[in-house]
Design a protein with these regions (language model features):
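A nucleotide- and high-energy phosphate-metabolite-utilizing enzyme signature
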Residues: 1-168
Length: 168
C-alpha cells in the first residue's frame, strides 16, 4: 500500500469533517517524479466521496464549530480587533469557502486555488448568490490588504493595534 493509498483509505473511512476542512486545502507537489496532478485528483475524489456521505446540516455545524473553536483559542482578547481569527475576520471567509468545497468539491476547477478565484467559481456555479459573493469578495479583499499593510508596519500580527498605541 502506498502513502497515497493509505491517505485515501483514511479519508474515505475515518476522517472527520474538521479534517476534511483542512484536506480541501491540500495541494500536490511535483518534485520530479511526475503524476502530481493525478495524485491530487485522486485525493480530491476521495474527499468528495467522503463528504458526500454527510448531509449539509452536519457539514455546516461541524465547520461552524471548528471556526468558533479557532476564534476562542486564537482571537485577540480585550479591546484589540483580530482581523484573522476574530468574528467577521478572514477565517470566516476561508471557512465559507471550505464549507462550499465540501458540499461539492467538483463544482470548481482544481486550478482555482485562491480565495478570490474560488468565490468567483462558486458564484458562477450558483452556489453563492450575487449578494453573498460581493460581500465575501469585498470583505476578503479589504481584510487581505489590511493584513498585508499591518504586517509591513508592525510585523506578523493579525491584531489591530489600539488607537492609543505609541506607533499610531
Amino acid at each position: 500500500i502506498t502513502f497515497r493509498g493509505a491517505l485515501i483509505e483514511y479519508i474515505e473511512s475515518e476522517a472527520s469533517i474538521w479534517e476534511l476542512l483542512a484536506y480541501v486545502q491540500m495541494r500536490a507537489l511535483n518534485i520530479g517524479t511526475g503524476g502530481a496532478d493525478h495524485h491530487e485528483a485522486s485525493i480530491r475524489d476521495a474527499i468528495h466521496r467522503r463528504a458526500s456521505r454527510e448531509d449539509r446540516a452536519t457539514i455546516k455545524h461541524e465547520a461552524r464549530a471548528m471556526r468558533l473553536r479557532l476564534e476562542r483559542t486564537h482571537a485577540a482578547r480585550g479591546r484589540n480587533v483580530d482581523i484573522k481569527f476574530g468574528a467577521g475576520g478572514l477565517l470566516d471567509v476561508y471557512f465559507v469557502v471550505r464549507y462550499l468545497l465540501l458540499l461539492d468539491l467538483r463544482a470548481i476547477a482544481p486550478e482555482a486555488m485562491t480565495t478570490s478565484a474560488r468565490l468567483d467559481a462558486f458564484a458562477a456555479a450558483g452556489m453563492l448568490s450575487a449578494e453573498d459573493h460581493a460581500a465575501l469578495h469585498e470583505g476578503h479583499g479589504f481584510l487581505s490588504t489590511l493584513d498585508h499593510s499591518l504586517r509591513l508596519a508592525f510585523g506578523r500580527s493579525s491584531r489591530l493595534p489600539r488607537a492609543n498605541h505609541p506607533v499610531m
